From Swiss-Prot:
Knocked-out gene: effects: When the gene is deleted the strain no longer inhibits 5'-processing of pre-tRNAs with short (<5 nucleotide) leaders in the absence of rppH. The truncated allele encoded by this protein has a slight growth defect, which is slightly exacerbated when combined with an rppH deletion. The truncated allele suppresses the loss of viability conferred by deletion of RNase 2 (rnb) during stationary phase at 31 and 42 degrees Celsius or starvation at 42 degrees Celsius.
Gene3D superfamilies with a match to the protein in the record: GHMP Kinase, N-terminal domain (3.30.230.70)
Pfam families, per database record: RNase_PH, RNase_PH_C
Binding-site positions, phosphate: 86, 124-126
Induction pattern: The catalytically inactive protein is present at significantly lower levels than restored wild-type protein (at protein level).
Source species of the chain: Escherichia coli (strain K12)
Superkingdom per UniProt: Bacteria
Protein name per UniProt: Truncated inactive ribonuclease PH
Record note on quaternary structure: Homodimer. No interaction between the inactive protein and RppH or RNase P was detected by immunoprecipitation.
Annotated InterPro entries: ExoRNase_PH_dom1, ExoRNase_PH_dom2, ExoRNase_PH_dom2_sf, PNPase/RNase_PH_dom_sf, Ribosomal_Su5_D2-typ_SF, RNase_PH, RNase_PH_bac-type, RNase_PH_CS
Additional remarks: The gene in K12 strains MG1655 and W3110 (and also other derivatives of K12 W1485) has a frameshift mutation that leads to loss of activity, although the protein is translated. Thus in those strains rph is an expressed, catalytically inactive protein. In strain K12 / MG1655(Seq)* the wild-type protein has been restored. For the functional protein without the frameshift mutation see AC P0CG18.
GO CC, alphabetical: cytosol
NCBIfam families: RNasePH
């Protein structure tokens, strides 16, 4: 029996509250069960130096966890003086996923920064961040259209992410912390709204997984990411 009695292919209740803050061009509070992440999208004119003069925009991301988003307090990375490897990996994943959803040429020379701050962690913070940041990004891009800086919204399509894994020998989706910490296989899948894959991160925590199990997990992710 899974936590809260969920079936193996059932995601936790998902809530997306738009315009959660008033200053950012796009802001969303995304909730996957007890995992809560604040996602904001901020627009700046101009692009990084390596893109200047190329007539295209850029999307980048930052990710962080509040000190008491977890069971015990974790010091802020700013206080430590450096970002951890996990943080850098996740924020690069968020940025890659959302760049795949936008026509960067149509965006023009604007930079959009996606900030994903975990308020409460109960598994799946990176997948929740991608899903929430996508909605914040759509709203920010629409502001550029409404302000007359873009003719059309350069968003090519929506993106969502979901975690899947093998727990106690069974394939399950949207793992909570207690499942994630005990999973034999842990995988994060980022997909477009039409079911195409942007990125797959999969790790065997114990026993290696088979090709057949990989296909089962991808099918499970595809089935559950579309409603998101």
């Amino acid at each position: 029996m899974r936590p809260a009695g969920r079936s193996n292919n059932q995601v936790r209740p998902v809530t997306l509250t738009r315009n959660y803050t008033k200053h950012a061009e796009g802001s969303v509070l995304v909730e996957f069960g007890d995992t809560k992440v604040l996602c904001t999208a901020s627009i700046e004119e101009g692009v990084p130096r390596f893109l200047k003069g190329q007539g295209q925009g850029w999307i980048t991301a930052e990710y962080g966890m509040l000190p008491r988003s977890t069971h015990t307090r974790n010091a802020r990375e700013a206080a430590k003086g450096k970002q951890g490897g996990r943080t850098m990996e996740i924020q690069r994943l968020i940025a890659r996923a959302l760049r795949a959803a936008v026509d960067l040429k149509a965006l023009g020379e604007f930079t959009i920064t996606l900030d994903c701050d975990v308020l409460q962690a109960d598994g799946g913070t990176r997948t929740a961040s991608i899903t929430g940041a996508c909605v914040a990004l759509v709203d920010a891009l629409q502001k550029l259209v409404e302000n007359g800086k873009l003719k059309t919204n350069p968003m090519k399509g929506m993106v969502a992410a979901v975690s899947v894994g093998i727990v106690n020998g069974e394939a399950v989706c949207d793992l909570e912390y207690v499942e994630d910490s005990a999973a034999e296989t842990d995988m994060n899948v980022v997909m477009t709204e039409d079911g195409r894959i942007i990125e797959v991160q999969g790790t065997a925590e114990g026993e290696p997984f088979t090709h057949e199990e990989l296909l089962i997990l991808l099918a499970l992710a595809r089935g559950e990411s579309n409603p998101l």
